[in-house]
Amino acid sequence: QVNIALLTVTDTRTINTDKSGAILVKKIKESNHNLIDRKIVKDEKDKIKKILLEWIKKDNLDIIITTGGTGLTGRDITPEAIKEITDKEIPGFGELFRELSYKTIGTSAMQSRACAVLANGKYIFALPGSSGGVTDAWDGILKYQLDINHKPCNFVELFPRLKEK
């Protein structure tokens, strides 16, 4: 079991209309993880960064998942907000995500800037705002990497060592 916070980045959705967030909430609970916080924020870098900085300081939080703001338009700035607080990038996540997306949406997959990083010993996964994108990311990557029993390795078993100096 891991403790997860979910941040939806959007200019148009509310908790009631956030389909991608609802999908992730369901998948988090089905996997027996704990959703300890959920927020919606506008596509504004300072507001996104403020919430992320607050969350990475929480001792009872392991993972932050964001949905939305990973495309190419002018308002899509989630990766930029995350980059400002990043300790280490996890490039394989975005690469694998785009490979999985390619199987579903073809070359349109290259328009996603989904990414993953470490910040203050916490994983941050930035997913697209589409329901298909969050489903691909969870079912194809996160479901396995957030399972302590997944072999040969997984993100969970690294928790104790993420803050090593």
Question: At which residue positions do the language-model features occur?
Answer:
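Non-catalytic beta/alpha edge segments that cap or flank active sites
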Residues: 1-165
